[in-house]
From Swiss-Prot:
Molecular-function annotations in GO: ATP binding; phosphoribosylaminoimidazolesuccinocarboxamide synthase activity
SUPFAM superfamilies (alphabetical): SAICAR synthase-like
Enzymatic class: ligase
Pathway(s) where this gene product acts: Purine metabolism; IMP biosynthesis via de novo pathway; 5-amino-1-(5-phospho-D-ribosyl)imidazole-4-carboxamide from 5-amino-1-(5-phospho-D-ribosyl)imidazole-4-carboxylate: step 1/2
Pfam families in alphabetical order: SAICAR_synt
Reaction catalysis annotation: 5-amino-1-(5-phospho-D-ribosyl)imidazole-4-carboxylate + L-aspartate + ATP = (2S)-2-[5-amino-1-(5-phospho-beta-D-ribosyl)imidazole-4-carboxamido]succinate + ADP + phosphate + 2 H(+)
Family, per entry: Belongs to the SAICAR synthetase family.
NCBIfam families for this protein: purC
EC number, as in UniProt: 6.3.2.6
Identification of the protein by name: Phosphoribosylaminoimidazole-succinocarboxamide synthase
This protein's encoding gene: purC
GO-annotated biological processes: 'de novo' IMP biosynthetic process; cobalamin biosynthetic process
Organism: Chlorobium luteolum (strain DSM 273 / BCRC 81028 / 2530) (Pelodictyon luteolum)
Sequence intervals crossing the membrane: none
Length: 239
């Protein structure tokens, strides 16, 4: 499978058309951004790490009944995917209070939430991806109530699968962002699952092992991403 036309370039990935109309190639970049592109940099080999982790986790989720856009891993940086009509909703699941949740509601950082919190954000960089509810999403025409119900249920199912998996490799799944898309009438999980889109803390020390190291200028970014990759892939499947 070969890349043809560049369909879209985002902050962390490029998406290329292929010679099959229903398939695209997602190429992972080393570019790093934070605060909706206000902070920019590069993390060496980030694309390789995130592709490897995402392929492993998507494969695991498929085995647990969560349909994803993954077809196969093509190379270190390239993932062959089903072409999706992306739903302009970012779904965030939170297990532990961190980041904007602490700022908005006064939670103590690190406090375990009684139940996972599911949040919807409008996928719009120009508006800084604002938090929204179901009524906003329907009014904006980005998703129907039925679709939003699927997104919420599917996101919680992903959490049910991934949270114990990460605990098994000594990582706390603090929170994570998911994106979904429509494919021939079906809603599939898309994008990626990686230290770019998740907060991971070491189970014993609470050391941050994700993009917060870039956001907060903590240093050791490459080592943190590599450590997550080692733990995830060392658990037994794809390399």
């Amino acid at each position: 499978m070969k890349k043809t036309t560049l369909l879209h370039e985002g902050k962390a990935k490029k998406v290329f058309l292929t010679d099959e109309a229903d398939l695209v190639i997602q190429e992972f970049k080393d570019d790093a951004t934070a605060f909706n592109n206000k902070k920019k940099g590069t993390i060496a080999e980030k694309g390789v790490v995130n592709n490897a982790i995402s392929c492993k986790l998507f494969t695991m989720l498929e085995g647990e009944g969560v349909r994803t856009h993954l077809v196969e891993k093509l190379s270190d940086r390239d993932m062959l995917c089903k072409k999706l009509d992306i739903i302009k909703v970012e779904v965030v699941v939170r297990n532990i209070a961190a980041g904007s949740l602490v700022k908005r509601y006064g939670f103590t950082e690190g406090s375990v939430l009684r139940e996972p919190i599911v949040e919807f954000y409008l996928k719009n960089d120009d508006l800084d991806d604002p938090l929204m509810n179901e009524s906003h999403a329907v009014a904006l025409g980005v998703a129907s109530l039925d679709e939003l119900a699927v997104l919420g249920t599917r996101a919680l199912r992903v959490n049910e699968v991934l949270k114990p998996f990460f605990a098994g490799v000594k990582l706390k799944l603090v929170d994570f962002k998911l994106e979904f898309g429509r494919h021939h009438g079906e809603i599939l999980l898309g994008d990626e699952i990686s230290p770019d889109t998740c907060r991971f803390w070491d189970l014993e020390t609470n050391e941050k092992l994700d993009k917060d190291r870039f956001r907060l200028d903590l240093g050791g970014i490459e080592d943190a991403y590599s450590e997550v990759q080692k733990r995830v892939l060392g658990s037994g499947a794809l390399s």
